[in-house]
């Protein structure tokens, strides 16, 4: 195990500035990606001196991740794989496969930053998670199909889903707007009502 200082937040390891131990292979990845430096006495001293600048750099990376999130908003992935009649793949879909698909679309996301909840071994629909930043994980739909026809069907299915979701959002927005107008109307009516004076007549005493 090697000790490294995180220069930015990393899932399952910690936030920027934390000293942690990792396996040599993972340490090489972190060092190559400039996500960490070796935990030497000199680097620990530099860390203390540059703590504020490291935090600022981390915030800038978070803003860049948010911008990437916007670009990924309408994206989805389709991958063609050979499978048996029961839909079981001859192999599996790995984070490296997802990273390659994203790279083909122009997005540079390392496979270490891609994860899903279970191994993908069957044809079907899945949600893969893209860790754009320690504090920002973006879900993306993945369709695993057997052939080009399946890819066309998956594309149509996804676009239909998007249209339904957009329509549902528009309906919710319209309903909320109507409710706001009704509330505003009721409030204005109440404000227009003047206070009414109630006069109670006294009873004359018998002479």
Swiss-Prot record:
Region (Disordered): 162-207
Keyword Magnesium attached: no
Gene3D superfamilies, sorted: Ribosomal protein L9, C-terminal domain (3.10.430.100), Ribosomal protein L9, N-terminal domain (3.40.5.10)
Alphabetical list of SUPFAM superfamilies matching this protein: L9 N-domain-like, Ribosomal protein L9 C-domain
Basic and acidic residues bias (residue ranges): 162-176
Superkingdom of source: Bacteria
GO terms, biological process: translation
Gene Ontology CC entries for this record: ribonucleoprotein complex; ribosome
InterPro entries attached to this UniProt entry: Ribosomal_bL9 (IPR000244), Ribosomal_bL9/RNase_H1_N (IPR009027), Ribosomal_bL9_bac/chp (IPR020594), Ribosomal_bL9_C (IPR020069), Ribosomal_bL9_C_sf (IPR036791), Ribosomal_bL9_N (IPR020070), Ribosomal_bL9_N_sf (IPR036935)
GO molecular function: rRNA binding; structural constituent of ribosome
UniProtKB keywords: Ribonucleoprotein, Ribosomal protein, RNA-binding, rRNA-binding
Annotated function: Binds to the 23S rRNA.
Family in the record: Belongs to the bacterial ribosomal protein bL9 family.
Protein name: Large ribosomal subunit protein bL9
Source species of the chain: Ehrlichia ruminantium (strain Gardel)
Higher taxonomy: Bacteria, Pseudomonadati, Pseudomonadota, Alphaproteobacteria, Rickettsiales
Gene: rplI
């Amino acid at each position: 195990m090697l000790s490294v200082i995180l220069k930015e937040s990393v899932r399952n390891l910690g936030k920027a500035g934390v000293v942690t131990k990792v396996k040599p292979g993972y340490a090489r990845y972190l060092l190559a990606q400039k996500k960490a430096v070796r935990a030497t006495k000199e680097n620990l001293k530099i860390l203390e001196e540059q703590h504020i600048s490291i935090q600022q750099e981390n915030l800038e990376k978070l803003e860049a991740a948010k911008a990437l999130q916007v670009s990924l908003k309408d994206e989805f992935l389709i991958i063609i794989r050979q499978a048996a009649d029961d839909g079981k793949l001859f192999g599996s879909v790995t984070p490296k496969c997802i990273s390659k698909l994203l790279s083909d679309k122009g997005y540079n996301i390392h496979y270490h930053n891609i994860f899903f909840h279970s191994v993908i071994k069957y044809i079907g629909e899945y949600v893969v998670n893209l860790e754009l930043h320690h504090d920002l994980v973006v879900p993306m739909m993945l369709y695993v199909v057997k052939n080009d026809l399946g890819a066309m069907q998956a594309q149509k299915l996804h676009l239909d889903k998007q249209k339904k979701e957009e329509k549902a959002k528009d309906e919710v927005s319209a309903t909320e707007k109507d409710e706001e107008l009704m509330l505003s109307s009721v409030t204005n009516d109440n404000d227009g009502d003047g206070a009414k004076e109630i006069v109670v007549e006294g009873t004359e005493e018998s002479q």
